[in-house]
């Protein structure tokens, strides 16, 4: 039995045949996939086509009860998912270190900053200090956005100074880059990175 930090029991997802997967329409307003699913498929596409090497970091697990039916075998009877101390994804693109977090919200007017934790913000600041490319991919308001870490830090610092505890919809639209949903890749965030960090005419937004 594996449990999340909130005590809920982990239920593995049912497998989906490759035939059914190919029939999914690339519509973000009516899709069967989560943001994580879309990003995993995107990263697989990048890897297969030798574009970038980006992987999702495994969720740390704390094992609390192990049964040994045989001397050479062990059965985990109880374990808990631990809260990650960093971000969801990391890897490399054109020699630059890539590190990002992925978040979703169903809020219709703003993106709550409570979706982040202090240690994640600190980790992203450390990545930026080492000249890494760090950002957040946000699914909100029926759209996917690419928000640079520096912009997130502004909203976070505002919250820490007893300011607004969320990013308004208009603020996100003003400071983030919308990512169009495609088929292969589904969420082409590398194209945004290319424009921001590798294009001769690149320029950060805002």
Curated annotation (Swiss-Prot):
Catalytic activity, as annotated: Endonucleolytic cleavage at a junction such as a reciprocal single-stranded crossover between two homologous DNA duplexes (Holliday junction)
Effect of residue 71 to A: Cleaves Holliday junctions, no interaction with RecA, greatly increased sensitivity to DNA-damaging agents
InterPro entries xref list: Resolv_RecU (IPR004612), Restrct_endonuc-II-like (IPR011335), tRNA_endonuc-like_dom_sf (IPR011856)
First-tier enzyme category under EC: hydrolase
Compositionally biased spans, kind Polar residues: 8-32
Record note on cofactor: Binds 1 Mg(2+) ion per subunit.
Effect of residue 36 to A/Q: Loss of activity
One GO MF term: endonuclease activity
UniProt subcellular location: Cytoplasm
Impact upon substituting residue 31 to A: Greatly increased sensitivity to DNA-damaging agents, chromosome segregation defects. Binds DNA and is able to cleave a Holliday junction
Binding positions (Mg(2+)): 86, 88, 101, 120
GO cellular component, one term: cytoplasm
Recorded consequence of changing residue 99 to A: Reduces Holliday junction resolution activity 6-fold
UniProt main location, coarse: cytoplasm
Region (Disordered): 1-34
Effect of residue 101 to A: Loss of Holliday junction resolution activity
One Pfam family hit: RecU
Subunit relationships: Homodimer. Interacts with RuvB.
Functional note: Has at least 2 separable functions; Holliday junction resolution with generation of monomeric chromosomes, and negative modulation of RecA activity. Endonuclease that resolves Holliday junction intermediates in genetic recombination. Cleaves mobile four-strand junctions by introducing symmetrical nicks in paired strands. Promotes annealing of linear ssDNA with homologous dsDNA. Required for DNA repair, homologous recombination and chromosome segregation. Partially inhibits the hydrolysis of dATP or rATP by RecA. Holliday junction resolution is stimulated by RuvB.
NCBIfam families: PRK02234.1-2, PRK02234.1-5, recU
Protein name: Holliday junction resolvase RecU
Organism: Bacillus subtilis (strain 168)
């Amino acid at each position: 039995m594996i449990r999340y930090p909130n005590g809920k029991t982990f239920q593995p997802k049912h497998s989906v045949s490759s035939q059914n997967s190919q029939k999914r329409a690339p519509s973000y307003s009516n899709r069967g996939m989560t943001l994580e699913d879309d990003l995993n498929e995107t990263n697989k596409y990048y890897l297969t086509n030798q574009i970038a090497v980006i992987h999702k970091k495994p969720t740390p697990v704390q094992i609390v009860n192990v049964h040994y039916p045989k001397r050479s075998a062990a059965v985990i009877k109880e374990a808990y998912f631990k809260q990650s101390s960093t971000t969801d994804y990391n890897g490399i693109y054109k020699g630059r270190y890539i590190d990002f977090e992925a978040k979703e919200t169903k809020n219709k007017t703003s993106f709550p900053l409570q979706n982040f934790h202090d240690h994640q913000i600190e980790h992203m600041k450390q990545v930026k200090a080492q000249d890494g490319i760090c950002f957040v991919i946000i699914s909100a308001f029926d759209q996917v956005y690419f928000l640079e870490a520096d912009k997130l830090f502004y909203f976070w610092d505002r919250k820490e100074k007893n300011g607004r505890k969320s990013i308004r919809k208009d603020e996100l639209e003003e400071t983030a880059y919308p990512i169009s949903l495609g088929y292969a890749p589904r969420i082409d965030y590398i194209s945004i990175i290319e424009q921001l960090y590798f294009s001769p005419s690149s320029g950060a937004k805002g």
